[in-house]
Amino acid sequence: MSYNLTDPYEIARYIKEAKKSTPIKAYIEGDLSNCDFTNIEKFNSGDLYILFGESEEILVIIENNKDKIKNCRIEQDRRKSAIPLLDMLKVNARIEPGAIIRDKVLIGENAVIMMGAVINIGAEIGEGTMVDMNAVVGARGKLGKNVHLGAGAVVAGVLEPPSSDPCTIEDNVLIGANAVILEGVKIGKGSVVAAGSIVTTDVPENVVVAGAPAKIIKEVDVKTKDKTKLLDDLRK
């Protein structure tokens, strides 16, 4: 079944209808030679087993064979999860450890996703764009090419409450640390959002905004461009 991920109600329907998953990893020492491992990925040597699968299936095996098990350790990182994480092997970008990127996200060539960044379903990250440490791109947020989203900054999602207009950050925009771009706001090409700003209305091209709520304080000039230039070496 296909879903229109530009529509917040379709995303909500996708989450509702998705099979919820609680995958676990189990490390077991014991005799499980007579067990049925259907739907479970199993690796073993002798009495040592590593199992990957849904919690309800693996826990049944553990419970039914507890007298044969010497040691057991279980690892899990989610419960009743509706959306898997993105398969990063298919992305030609630099993605650092600790970034959380949900499936159905588009990431452009040579983008950089730093530690602790969170990118939600339906978001788009343009070519050469950096999402810095602990920054958040909410559902359906759109970042153009060569954008810098500063550490701790937030591009609000438009899933709940639902909105038809996502946040749009156009090409060559720099958003300072801990800035917040509210739902549906558009930031024009080449503009700069000062650190800590709260942007509540659309921003035209090639201006600098600052404050809470953010207001235009000047046009982008040579000095501003020099202070906010990106480093290509970070994107190689």
From Swiss-Prot:
Q: Which enzyme type, at the first EC level?
A: transferase
The organism sits in which domain of life? Bacteria
Q: Which family does it belong to?
A: Belongs to the transferase hexapeptide repeat family. DapH subfamily.
Record protein name field = 2,3,4,5-tetrahydropyridine-2,6-dicarboxylate N-acetyltransferase
InterPro entries, per database record: DapH, DapH_N, Hexapep, Hexapep_transf_CS, Trans_hexapeptide_repeat, Trimer_LpxA-like_sf
Q: In which pathway does it act?
A: Amino-acid biosynthesis; L-lysine biosynthesis via DAP pathway; LL-2,6-diaminopimelate from (S)-tetrahydrodipicolinate (acetylase route): step 1/3
Q: What is its EC number?
A: 2.3.1.89
- Report the Pfam families cross-referenced here: DapH_N, Hexapep_2
